[in-house]
Regions:
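Phosphate-backbone binding interfaces of nucleic-acid-interacting proteins
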Residues: 1-91
Length: 91
């Protein structure tokens, strides 16, 4: 089912060329839900994001990374405190 919050592991992260503002294009491993692409806006180093886990909202056409907007730090993605299986639902 789409529109669920779940944990995805970042399998790939690269700068999104041609974007109006800095952003990364992410490929997320969602476990039994497969993979999805998502955009993470802001100044993020792809090497710091790759192989980490992020909370995202799964949609029919991809995923949206759940993040908090901090005036001092920009977009801060939400992450689990401990590693869990990719695709773990957030409740």
């Amino acid at each position: 089912m789409a529109d669920e919050l779940l944990v995805g592991t970042v399998a790939a992260a690269e700068q999104q060329p041609g974007a109006r503002a800095p952003a990364l294009l992410l490929t997320l491993d969602l476990g039994t839900y497969g993979t999805a692409q998502a955009v993470l806006p802001g100044q993020h180093d792809p090497d710091d994001i790759r192989d980490t886990q992020l909370v995202c909202r799964r949609e029919d056409d991809g995923a949206i990374v759940v993040a908090a907007h901090s005036h001092g730090k920009g977009m801060v993605p939400l992450r689990p405190d401990v590693e869990v299986e990719p695709g773990t639902l957030v409740s």
